[in-house]
UniProtKB/Swiss-Prot annotation:
It comes from Homo sapiens. This is Uncharacterized protein C1orf105. Pfam families: DUF4548. InterPro entries: DUF4548. It comes from the Eukaryota.
Amino acid sequence: MEKRELKASVPKFDKIPWLSEASLVNKPLVLSLPRRYPHTSATFLTSSKKNMNLPILFQVPDVLSKARRNQCDSMLLRNQQLCSTCQEMKMVQPRTMKIPDDPKASFENCMSYRMSLHQPKFQTTPEPFHDDIPTESIHYRLPILGPRTAVFHGLLTEAYKTLKERQRSSLPRKEPIGKTTRQ
């Protein structure tokens, strides 16, 4: 049997055209990398003139600080659109809540706490409760009713019913005016 060596001719690239010495001396190489922030480019590839073989990867700290500042400004703009109580809650440390074993009771506690937050602080006379639209005639429908959304929908309807019952029970009831007989 004859042993034969296979040889393939592979072209040798001595100089890469876009990484030639002239292009390195004239201007730095800027690659189009995907940007983390659309308004800034934080990453550049440039070559050092001392070591021509390896490009140096560095990030400009000024650009990153500007990006962080812009992100913080957008958060402030978003908070300004909220009401004053929500904005106060954003700035205050979050409070710890003990969640009881009964999920229905914990949801009621959370809802009553949230409703108390949105009550106006300076209220001289309470406005009477006007039930313009009967809620029984409105059917809330979810787009896709799977097993998870069905459970969630059940929790929401139970919480909504208990909330309505509490609102109705907390309002002063009008006594029915009966006919009084004169004696």
